[in-house]
């Protein structure tokens, strides 16, 4: 029997506000343990939460970007549970009236087709702290993350393969990143994914028993974990077994999912309205103000790059994969840079440099201005493409102007015949054996002189001019 895969995803996104959702403490990632805390985060008696308006701004933007309806009568709820990283013994979240609901996002699949994935809801809430278990036998609680604002985005169970889940996450990350409300860095925990997966016979309307997957620390692992679960569950069902409702984690080492716990029923969190936060209204004017702050989204940019700039679909997809790269490209083209040349550099030498250095585009000294200037001096013959690679590395590490560096470093391309011809003659004089081979008619003997000439000029000879002059002087040499 063949089975249909049914997948839904729950994605927690950390919002990049300066302060936490209900306290004025810094929400910055990476500080020393328990330094980003105050009496509200520690839940001291008598302290009251104060809602950060910037969090609601971000929630509205996310809802608009994901084509969602917005609940304009806003309130928060208490989700009750006890855990050491949750001092209040409850989490302030949203239950029956999330900020956004009934949305969708269009994703592009590997075969080039598109699919619309429904989004059930998006709700605002506070993050919990972090437990760490030491080798000394003690466990420690770091409350820096306690109260950091989150938006949880819950998809409909519309995905029918791990590939579709991967495409959904890619599209969701792009949209959230472009809104500017989060950096969505999974390695820093600002985007976290839980997956729910079940199988059912084709044609059956009712969902099968679902398994929840955790410990999915990359999009690749989401896909691998889901692929493993499809095989595991299908094997159980084909053998006549029954799928238990479980929470499992993906283990990278064994490339399998491992049981964490069996779920016997839905947890009872005893939700009730948060009494310490007043109800408030999200006005039409507020929504429209947030709408005006939304950028052009990746799908629209891709279409424009193809239609107006003549780029291929592949190039457009690569350039818009991150907002940083796309904004850099936009700025370079606005400065007069040739779109195809800028695209080639960003996808070629720039991408290779970033991978080798383990950095992002905003962490190096390359700017749209100096990249465009460098491309211009390649096109006007000041430097060769080979020398340009050296110039680029300097700009990436040190910044500054491309032309200024080329002139100071003596990297200007040699194109003057009156300079090149004497160098060619010196090459002949320094390589008598090669000259003898050439004169005797040895096959491909002339090609050696190209390397000799480029070495003599330290790669600065204009290739087109140099090859023409070399051919001219070799012809004379043969006649002698």
Curated annotation (Swiss-Prot):
Q: Which Pfam families match?
A: GatB_N, GatB_Yqey
EC assignment: 6.3.5.-
Q: Which reaction does it catalyse?
A: L-glutamyl-tRNA(Gln) + L-glutamine + ATP + H2O = L-glutaminyl-tRNA(Gln) + L-glutamate + ADP + phosphate + H(+); L-aspartyl-tRNA(Asn) + L-glutamine + ATP + H2O = L-asparaginyl-tRNA(Asn) + L-glutamate + ADP + phosphate + 2 H(+)
EC main class here is: ligase
One GO BP annotation of this record: glutaminyl-tRNAGln biosynthesis via transamidation
Q: Does the keyword RNA-binding apply?
A: no
Q: Does the keyword Zinc apply?
A: no
SUPFAM superfamilies cross-referenced by the UniProt entry: GatB/YqeY motif (SSF89095), Glutamine synthetase/guanido kinase (SSF55931)
Q: Member of which family?
A: Belongs to the GatB/GatE family. GatB subfamily.
Species of provenance: Streptococcus thermophilus (strain ATCC BAA-250 / LMG 18311)
Protein name listed in UniProt: Aspartyl/glutamyl-tRNA(Asn/Gln) amidotransferase subunit B
> What superkingdom heads the lineage?
Bacteria
GO function term, MF aspect, one? asparaginyl-tRNA synthase (glutamine-hydrolyzing) activity
Q: Whom does it interact with, and what assembly results?
A: Heterotrimer of A, B and C subunits.
InterPro entries reported for this sequence: Asn/Gln-tRNA_amidoTrfase_suB/E, Asn/Gln-tRNA_Trfase_suB/E_cat, Asn/Gln_amidotransferase, Asn/Gln_tRNA_amidoTrase-B-like, GatB, GatB_C_1, GatB_Yqey_C_2, Gln-tRNA_amidoTrfase_suB_CS
